[in-house]
């Protein structure tokens, strides 16, 4: 468990016209999700045995055309995604830390896909914000180095997300 305080910097950018999530709310809840993950999972994450005082990450809101472009350009997959993560720190074997600051990377979310998902899955009765924070919590797991290549890993990631979402009172997901 971490003894010293960690500063968390979250920067958001919205290039999607169809919905403007509340930036303050996004930053505050994302910080709480990340704090939960650090307190629960640091030893299993890419932060283990690292000396840091600050964690930085970016969240970009866009449309599915943009995520398709990213998928095509960086992952050789030509289809849109609801979320793409660029885990700069977890994926770099050098794990560069500058002045105690770790840049975890970037979460890119297609807000049109979020809206589409909520409208499609009426039976789940999630609102846009719940769906959005489900995706953000998932992206944070990837930025911390967790993946889900196997069913076991997938179940672990989803179980941890559910616990984290309880911290921001989105435990119905």
Short names for language-model regions:
Residues 136:
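A conserved beta-strand element that flanks and buttresses the S-adenosyl-L-methionine
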Residues 1-133, 144-173:
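An acidic/histidine-cluster motif and surrounding catalytic segment
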